[in-house]
Amino acid sequence: AEQGYAIELDIQITKDGRIVVFHDDTMKRMCGNEGKISDYTYEELQQFHLGDSTEKIPLLREVLQTVDGRVPLLIEIKMPGLSTAVCAGFQKEMEGYTGMFCMESFNSLALRWCRRHMPQTLRGQLSGRFSKDDKVHLILRIMARHLMLNFIGKPDFIAYDHRYADCPGFLIDRMLFRTPAFAWTVKDEHVYNRTRKKFDAAIFEH
């Protein structure tokens, strides 16, 4: 935040409907225990620490209070299924927040929900190459990779895995619709310079 760059973060919903900031699909890597965020209530999550630190999984509202509009936020909504409860929770948490923010998701249904209920919020479609481990039907994986589900979410921008920027679907979208595109995740200057030819901006690690 001190450098003025936007912050990308991921949100998930707990078993009792609280919206927390947490990246991974499971808690194994960061907390050392099995299960997903949605398997626990927020109170139960407070027994776990992040890595070797004393920090705990924060609520979205706590992060919003810390950032306090100093830099823009790019908020990824983790929505693995059909339930839009996390979207409704996101809307509630963002009410009254005066800082700049936009949302993104791999799930086109999350974009559609936000388009209907938060029409002033910019929406981004995340995509890239999907594997069998993603537990998504083959046809849906192909359609998502080639951005063939954009008619559902009608994204304002694309956030695409830069390693697969030669994907026909991505190239066609760029040529025909000229949808602004973010490259993810850029980890060094060499990759950044290479992605500048095909993308408008980058989501990077520091």
Model-found features: residue ranges?
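Active-site flanking residues adjacent to catalytic metal/cofactor-binding acidic residues
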Residues: 7-9, 22-23, 75-77, 204
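Glycine-rich, proline-tolerant flexible connector loops at the mouths of alpha/beta enzymes
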Residues: 13-26
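The start of beta-strands in P-loop NTPase/AAA+ ATPase cores
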Residues: 3-5, 18-19, 71, 102
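Metal-dependent phosphodiesterase/phospholipase catalytic core, i.e.
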Residues: 23-131, 151-155, 159-163
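Short alpha-helical
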Residues: 14-15, 81, 109, 165, ...
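C-terminal active-site rim and adjoining tail of enzyme catalytic domains
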Residues: 133-206
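Catalytic domains of carbohydrate-active enzymes, especially glycoside hydrolases
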Residues: 1-13, 152-157
